Amino acid sequence: TDMVMSFPYILLVLVAAAIFKPGLWSIILILGFVDWPGVARLVRGNVLSLRETNFVKGNVVAGMPLRHILFSEILPNTVAPILVYATSVMAISMLDEAALSFLGMGVQPPMASLGNMLNGAQSITVLTSQPWLWLPPGIMIVVLVVSINFVGDALRDAFDPSGGRR
C-alpha cells in the first residue's frame, strides 16, 4: 500500500489511463486500483486500535473464538469509518472520471459522461456564445460532488452523533 501511495495520485491515474484502452471498465479498474491503499490503511488502523480496546481484550480473555471477535466486535466498529470514507472516495472518483473523459482518456463519446459533455465546449466561441453546452454538465458535477459530501457528513453524524459538531 505504501508503494502505491508514494506516487502522486493524479500522475498514477493519468499514466494508467494512457496505458490501458479508454473505456468505462478500464476507468473503474484504474480508479479502484489507485484508491484501494487508502481503504486498506483505514481498515488496518481501525482494526489495530480496536484490538487494544477493553471489550476486545475481554473477549480474548473469556476464550471467545477469533471469528466471533472479528464479526461481532471488530467488524461492526469498522464499517462506519469505511462508509464515510467511501463517500469521499466516490466524490473524488467522479471528479477523476470527468477529468479523464474531458481529456479523452476516459469514457468514449457514444457513452454519456459529464467529462465528454464538457469536452465539446473547448473553443472560446462555444464558451461565450453557447453556455448551454457546458454550463449544465459543470453545474451537475458540482451538485453531485457536494451532494455526495453531504451524504458523507450525514453518515458521519449518524454513526458518531457526538463527533464534535455543535
PLM regions and their residue ranges:
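Alpha-helical transmembrane segments of integral membrane proteins
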Residues: T1-R166
